[in-house]
Regions:
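N-terminal pro-sequences and low-complexity stem/linker regions of secreted or lumenal proteins
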Residues: 1-258
Length: 258
């Protein structure tokens, strides 16, 4: 109950509900937080912030939650937008180190500090990214952001530009044998940008590594836009994507048991 607005389930009772994105910038996040009172969410982000899903809407996710331990105390690292939180995911901070200023917007300027893949290399821990390359993982291709082609933007392949380490200069123009080259690993199911919905070729590399027992010690999976559950895409796309990942992992009982 916030600002006289009660929680509300979506009108369409299934996971194909498409919600528009709410404000998720630094200013609105801190306004909703309100110095720890957390009482200004509706005022800062509209009444839609009170929406929620039930087991009827997202049955697959509820089934997973009932079958497995789920870390449900999940919070973002920064009360701010997407890229600073992805910088936390892959570097442990959003700047303010190595001479870089703190990032509180979606810019990736001046990203020059040490990333987690580099720390894993130094510790002798293997790692790999599983993603689709879209039309390419270089700067000119948007680092794998959803491709453009045909009649307009397509969202079924690429990685939505969400592999943020690729914005660091040292990850660009990597040679094949470079220790950071696993950041460029990925399928490329349609380099021309004519994506096909629900294409299981997205999981070929993960399936092969599971089957061959060659999974790295740390794996990062970066989904295309349509399956990321980022507004305005539906939860059903994320459920399909997660189910294919679990199908790949459980296909090898020895790997699954580990």
């Amino acid at each position: 109950f916030q600002s006289w607005a009660r929680p509300a389930a979506p009108a369409t009772r299934n996971s194909d509900t498409y919600f528009a994105g709410l404000a998720h910038d630094w200013n609105s996040g801190h306004a909703a937080w309100h110095n720890g009172l957390h009482d200004s969410w509706v005022a800062a982000k509209s009444q839609q912030t009170m929406a929620y899903f039930t087991s009827q809407d997202i049955p697959y996710y509820y089934a997973l939650a009932q079958a497995f331990t789920v870390c449900d105390g999940y919070h973002c690292s920064q009360l701010g937008p997407t890229n600073p939180n992805r910088l936390y995911l892959w570097t442990g901070c959003c700047g303010n180190v190595a001479g870089a200023t703190p990032h509180i917007d979606n810019g990736t300027y001046g990203a020059n500090w040490t990333t987690l893949p580099e720390r894993l290399n130094a510790a002798g821990v293997s790692w790999k990214f599983y993603q689709d390359r879209g039309q390419g993982l270089d700067h000119g291709s948007g680092f794998g952001e959803y491709p453009t082609g045909g009649g307009g933007d397509l969202w079924w392949n690429g990685n939505y530009g969400d592999n943020t380490v690729l914005n660091f200069a040292r990850y660009q123009n990597l040679a094949a044998g470079d220790p950071l080259a696993p950041a460029l690993n990925g399928t490329q199911i349609d380099p021309k940008g004519n994506g096909t919905p629900y294409d299981t070729r997205l999981f070929q590399q993960l399936q092969a590594d599971v089957a061959n027992g060659t999974l790295p010690q740390v794996s990062w999976i970066v989904a295309p836009y349509a399956y990321s559950e980022h507004p305005s895409w539906a939860t059903s796309g994320g459920e399909w994507y997660v189910s294919n990942i679990l199908d790949a992992l459980t296909a090898n009982p020895e790997v699954w048991a580990s």
